[in-house]
């Protein structure tokens, strides 16, 4: 779960 959340944030950056 956490990994997916961080992945989404990284995509935005």
Swiss-Prot record:
Keyword Secreted applies: yes
Cellular component annotations (GO), alphabetically ordered: extracellular region
Location in or out of the cell: Secreted
Main localisation: secreted
Domain of life: Eukaryota
Modified residue annotations for Leucine amide: 13
Tissue-level expression: Expressed by the skin glands.
A biological process term (GO) from this entry: innate immune response
Keyword line: Amidation, Amphibian defense peptide, Antibiotic, Antimicrobial, Immunity, Innate immunity, Secreted
Function: Antimicrobial peptide.
Similarity remark: Belongs to the frog skin active peptide (FSAP) family. Temporin subfamily.
Protein name: Temporin-1Tt
């Amino acid at each position: 779960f956490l990994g997916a959340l961080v992945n989404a944030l990284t995509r935005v950056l």
